[in-house]
Structures are given as C-alpha cells and as structure tokens.
C-alpha cells in the first residue's frame, strides 16, 4: 500500500504524515462506519506524548465529526489501551496517534476495527483512495454533525482492567520501570502501586520532545544501572506507546522479548495454559529460543515480523502465546495485540509463582550471539535485488558454514533494510552482518 505499512501510516510530522492526511483519515472513517450502519459512528481516539500528537488529534477529530461521527478522546494512553477500550466500549473503530519507538519528530496513525484487531487492508485501501482524491464522502450538516466527548473514564477503565488481570500481590517487591517519557508515564505506576509493589520510576516526565530519547525499550542502559544501583528485584522498560516491554533482571542484564516468550511459555505450559504446547515467535527471533523451547518440551511455529503477523498466526493455529524479540508479546487468551504493561504483569506472575529470580528463570534459554543493523536506503526493493547485495548475503551465509544464519528484510515502517546475523560466536556474527551492511551502504 502507498501510505499504510505494517504499523499504520507513519512518517515525519508534517512531512511524510501531515495534518491534511489526518483530517482526511478522520473524514473517511467517520463517514464509512456511519454509512455502513445507518447511524452515527462512534470512534475512540488515543495519543502518545509527542508534541505533534496534539496537532494530529485535533485534525483527526475534526475530520471525524465533520463526517458525522462522535469522537471519544482518551487523550494520552498506551496503544493497547485503545484496542481494549474499542472492544469494551463497543466502538466502531479505534485510532491511536503514535510512532511507537521512533523519535519525537515522527508520528503515525494506527487503526483498529471493532474487534480490537488492526484494521483490515481492504478498508485501509479505501482510505488511501480517498486521501488521493479517487473518491468523495459527504460532509455532515445540522444535527448530523458529530460530537466530541472527553473520555478519560476509558483510560481509567483500562488501568482497572490491568489491575484486575493480576491475581497476585507484589507486596515487598522492588520494581523499576522506565516509561520512555511516553504513554506509560501516567498509567504504569498506578497499576504496580495498586498491587502493592515498591515502584521506582524513571523517564516519566514527558515534555513533547523527550519521548524515547536515550530511554525506554530501545535504550536500556539507564534502567540497567537503576536496577543495580537501587538493588531492585526486576525492571521493565516500555517504548513510546507502551505496546512493547523488555525487562532487566536483578543482576542488571537485559531480558529481551525472546527470553520473555521462553519464561512465559514454559510457565503457561507447566500449568496447562499454553494452547497446543506451542509458542509463536517470528522469523527474526533468535534460533536459540527455538532450540530452548524444544528442549523444554514445547513447539514453535514462526510468523512474519510484526505483531499483526504474529497474531494472525496465533489465530490461524489457535495458539495462545506469541511475540517478537523487540518486546511485542501477545497473550492470546486476554488480548489481541502487544501490551507492554500486561507483559510485565505476566512476567511478575511467573516470578511470584515460581519463587525464582528472573535470572534463574531465563538461565535455561540459551540464545545464539547476534549482530543486527538497520541500513538506510533510497529504494528498499531495489536494494534487496542488487547483485552486489545478493552476493554479500551468499558470502555471509557461506562463512557461517551451516552453524548460523542471516536474515535480511525490509522494514515495514522505515526506509531501511534490517540485517540480522546469528553465529556460535559474536565475532562470526559481527563479520557476517558487516559484510552485508557494507554492500548495502555502497549503493
């Protein structure tokens, strides 16, 4: 598609994604869901803490009400909170304004349908046609113009649902959380407070510009120091819209999404709560995770990269747990998309039930050394088809002699090619990755 990628419509604010785009998305969505149901559409809208999110919210809501929809504003909330409230409140559509882990200058618009799933591609194609002027929708007039509703109660209900999902106490547990100066800043602490934890929060003072800046799940160093210096039991880091979660164990070591899948998968399987004894990682997950799951008596079925593809594979096979190394973890029995705060609660459930530290729980998961890089390119398709790049990939694979692997793929949200190499030792992984990266950088 032209505008919508694997994680919505994303771009630099007022460059790749403009207020005109936001207004037109609102116009089409407001009309589409009303016309198809012969009544006013009800659309719920959330945003992250970027300066531009407020601008895009105003444009989007203007478009919605101009087409006759009632717009319910959740204000700042994690992306999974929008999906949760779309379903709980029986809304026709949910819209989140966020560029997730990207820098503050970027932004994005994600849409979910009434079931809380990411919007069907056929609807997104209709929106793109309207943006490009290939179709028209009428303006509402008179009493058909929509209303704007301050819906802070929806955010409060989302927080209450997170608390209610935890049937355990965290009394006496010292937990560090890094809110990335994003959507988790006003949501995560109340959840852990309600469960009795001793919570030490960092990076929860958003100013519109500091979202994801040297903090959160893409910059774990400060949380690692925080856990060690404060003598905490565990730490959790979210990204800008809090749909991802990575952890830090009591020794200050990062626990990535693959390790979280392992810990939760083994625990759920032990208690008969893992459907089919199967976990759904992605093709980019560490091969060591697959082998470790097999040694623990579990199966793995891989999906494409992106939580949309993970959940599609989970639905297809009736599986209940899946996720990505980056920290998107989906617990299919209670949610339809990655939820960073929910993930941290599920990890705490395992720690409390098993009476083990996070380092003890992750110890059996033996990951292979990896090397990763994202290389900016002008044309992603042309880059992958380039003969020099193809030769570099073949040479890198040959250098690993069947004891590792390389994965080279297009990003679904940025103009980059992502290169991943795995090998028995770090030096071999680094060498394979650098060989391919050099070929891409030479284009």
Describe the role of every protein-language-model region.
Residues 1-62, 66-67, 148-175:
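An N-terminal, well-structured beta->alpha segment
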Residues 4-5, 45, 71-75, 96-97, ...:
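General beta-strand structural signal in soluble alpha/beta enzymes
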Residues 12, 107-230:
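Gly/Ser/Thr-enriched, mixed-charge loops and adjacent short helices
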Residues 31, 42-106, 190-248:
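N-terminal small/polar loop signature for handling phosphorylated ligands or for N-terminal nucleophile
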Residues 45-48, 177-179, 249, 333, ...:
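Short glycine-centered, acidic/aromatic-flanked micro-motifs in structured strand/loop junctions
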Residues 125-159, 164, 250-323, 330-331:
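Proline/glycine-rich low-complexity loops and linkers
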Residues 234, 271-443:
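Phosphate-binding and adjacent anionic-ligand microenvironments
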């Amino acid at each position: 598609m032209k505008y919508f990628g694997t994680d919505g419509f994303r771009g630099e604010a007022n460059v790749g994604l403009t207020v005109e785009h936001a207004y037109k998305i609102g116009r089409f969505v407001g009309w589409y869901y009303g016309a198809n149901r012969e009544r006013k559409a009800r659309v719920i809208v959330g945003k992250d803490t970027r300066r531009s999110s407020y601008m895009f919210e105003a444009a989007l809501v203007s478009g919605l009400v101009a087409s006759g929809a009632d717009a319910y504003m959740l204000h700042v909330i994690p992306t999974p909170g929008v999906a949760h409230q779309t379903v709980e409140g029986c809304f026709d559509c949910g819209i989140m304004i966020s560029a997730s882990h990207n820098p503050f200058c970027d932004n994005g618009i994600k849409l979910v349908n009434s079931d809380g799933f990411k919007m069907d591609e056929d609807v997104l194609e209709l929106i793109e046609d309207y943006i490009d002027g290939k179709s028209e929708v009428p303006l509402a007039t008179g009493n058909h113009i929509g209303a704007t509703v301050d819906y802070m109660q929806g955010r409060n209900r989302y927080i209450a649902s997170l608390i209610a999902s935890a049937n355990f106490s965290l009394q006496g547990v010292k937990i560090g959380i890094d809110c990335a100066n994003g959507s988790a800043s006003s949501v995560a602490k109340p959840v852990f407070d309600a469960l009795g934890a001793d919570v030490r929060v960092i990076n929860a003072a958003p100013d519109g510009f500091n979202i994801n800046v040297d903090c959160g799940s893409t910059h774990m160093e400060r949380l690692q120091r925080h856990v060690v210096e404060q003598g905490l039991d565990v730490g959790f880091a979210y990204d800008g819209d809090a749909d991802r979660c990575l952890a830090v164990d009591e020794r200050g070591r990062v626990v990535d999404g693959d390790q979280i899948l392992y810990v939760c998968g083994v625990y759920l399987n032990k208690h008969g709560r893992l459907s089919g004894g199967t976990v759904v990682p992605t093709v980019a997950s560490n091969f060591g995770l697959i082998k470790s799951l097999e040694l623990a008596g579990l199966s793995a079925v891989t999906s494409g990269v992106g939580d949309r593809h993970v959940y599609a594979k989970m639905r297809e096979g009736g599986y209940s747990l899946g996720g990505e190394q980056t920290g998107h973890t989906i617990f299919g029995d209670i949610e339809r998309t990655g939820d960073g705060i929910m993930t941290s609660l599920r990890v705490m459930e395992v720690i409390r039930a098993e009476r083990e530290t996070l380092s003890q729980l992750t110890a059996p998961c033996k990951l292979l050394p990896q090397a990763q890089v994202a290389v900016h390119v002008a044309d992603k398709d042309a880059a992958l088809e380039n003969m020099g790049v193809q030769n570099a990939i073949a040479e890198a694979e040959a250098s690993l002699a069947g004891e590792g692997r390389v994965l080279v793929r297009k990003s679904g949200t940025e103009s980059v090619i992502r290169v991943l190499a795995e090998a028995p030792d770090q030096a071999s992984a680094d060498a394979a990755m650098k060989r391919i990266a050099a070929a891409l950088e030479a284009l």
